[in-house]
């Protein structure tokens, strides 16, 4: 179920999510989680942007997509109340959140936490 570098990893089952998250934490890279829903128009709008960011930051971050309807407990664990919500984890701790389909804010927040300057 592992994705190649630069790809968004979709997690649809709780046991797959747990394994993928543990593996990502061991990489010491920034973890970026897109909490989304199939019925959410802003989520669909930002999906290609999120995929592009996964390619742009592939050397310093791992990107996940979690459907809040499929993994409700995971969404609750991270305090997700609106979609899309992007949660950033570094060294096992939540370091930032971006709520809404705000691509510039998402890009800037990822760049800040990876230390990677991109245009």
Swiss-Prot record:
Asked if the Swiss-Prot or TrEMBL record annotates the protein with the keyword Coiled coil, the reply is: no
Q: Which GO terms describe its molecular function?
A: protein-disulfide reductase activity
Disulfide bond residue pairs: 40-43
- What is the protein's major site of localization? cytoplasm
Keyword Transport annotated: yes
State a single Pfam family of this protein. Answer: Thioredoxin
Q: In which tissues is it expressed?
A: Preferentially expressed in floral tissues.
Matches recorded under InterPro entries:
Thioredoxin, Thioredoxin-like_sf, Thioredoxin_CS, Thioredoxin_domain, Thioredoxin_H-type-like
The domain of life for this entry's organism is Eukaryota
User: Where is this protein found?
Assistant: Cytoplasm
Q: Which residues cross the membrane?
A: none
GO cellular component term, pick one = cytoplasm
Please list the residue ranges annotated as the Thioredoxin domain. 2-115
SUPFAM superfamilies linked to this entry? Thioredoxin-like (SSF52833)
The similarity comment for this entry is: Belongs to the thioredoxin family. Plant H-type subfamily.
User: What NCBIfam families does the entry give?
Assistant: thioredoxin (TIGR01068)
| Name recorded for this polypeptide | Thioredoxin H-type 2
Which species does this protein come from? Brassica napus (Rape)
Q: What is the name of the gene encoding this protein?
A: THL-2
